[in-house]
Amino acid sequence: MTNQLIYTGKAKDIYSTKDENMIRTVYKDQATMLNGARKETIDGKGALNNQISSLIFEKLNMAGVVTHYIEQISKNEQLNKKVDIIPLEVVLRNVTAGSFSKRFGVEEGRVLETPIVEFYYKNDDLNDPFINDEHVKFLGIVNDEEIAYLKGETRRINELLKDWFAQIGINLIDFKLEFGFDNDGKIILADEFSPDNCRLWDAEGNHMDKDIFRRDLGSLTDAYQVVLDKLKTLD
């Protein structure tokens, strides 16, 4: 059925389209934390995230990364390929921050000699637990070869993103990616890339990401607008 709501999430709603292999993604003006325990409507957030994610995915596509992104169709909507989402959050950390610092008792801001890739099991009931490769295989999520691909592709994407953000004076601290299987069974990048699912610090260490909301540091949309404006200056 066309235009049927098929999934509602914390930050996005997904609708069917005339093409069964495509979906329409609508970005919402909602900010959440602690798996939705705290919610707040922030006018303009959805449009900013959609525009930032669209710009990043367009550049990734051009760089040879296979993604679900097709096109931006309005300020807060985009057209995507339909995929079967892999229930893993793939997190890459360039600098210690957030839960990593708390888990291992290290200060925020320590540059990691080698970026660290982590897996989290996408399960709201379990609060998305931190898991390792053996857990991933035990749960039957993906196999050894697919684990290696997810890690390698995430590291490749990191090198591209770090370079782009460095060009506009922003440090890419960490980020979360999601992948899915397309109709041909190929793993491709899905979901989004916005300040909602990464940490971005300017040269002075000021947050330009969702930590502004988490830590009550000021205007979320003002910071997101700066990120968007800077990204638009990239070649």
Swiss-Prot record:
Pathway: Purine metabolism; IMP biosynthesis via de novo pathway; 5-amino-1-(5-phospho-D-ribosyl)imidazole-4-carboxamide from 5-amino-1-(5-phospho-D-ribosyl)imidazole-4-carboxylate: step 1/2. Keywords: ATP-binding, Ligase, Nucleotide-binding, Purine biosynthesis. GO terms for biological process: 'de novo' IMP biosynthetic process; cobalamin biosynthetic process. It holds the Pfam family SAICAR_synt. Coiled coil: none annotated. GO terms for molecular function: ATP binding; phosphoribosylaminoimidazolesuccinocarboxamide synthase activity. CDD domains: SAICAR_synt_PurC (cd01415). Its EC number is 6.3.2.6. Disulfide bonds: none annotated. Gene3D superfamilies: ATP-grasp fold, B domain (3.30.470.20), Phosphorylase Kinase, domain 1 (3.30.200.20). InterPro entries: SAICAR_synt/ADE2_N, SAICAR_synt_PurC, SAICAR_synth, SAICAR_synthetase, SAICAR_synthetase_CS. Belongs to the SAICAR synthetase family. This is Phosphoribosylaminoimidazole-succinocarboxamide synthase.
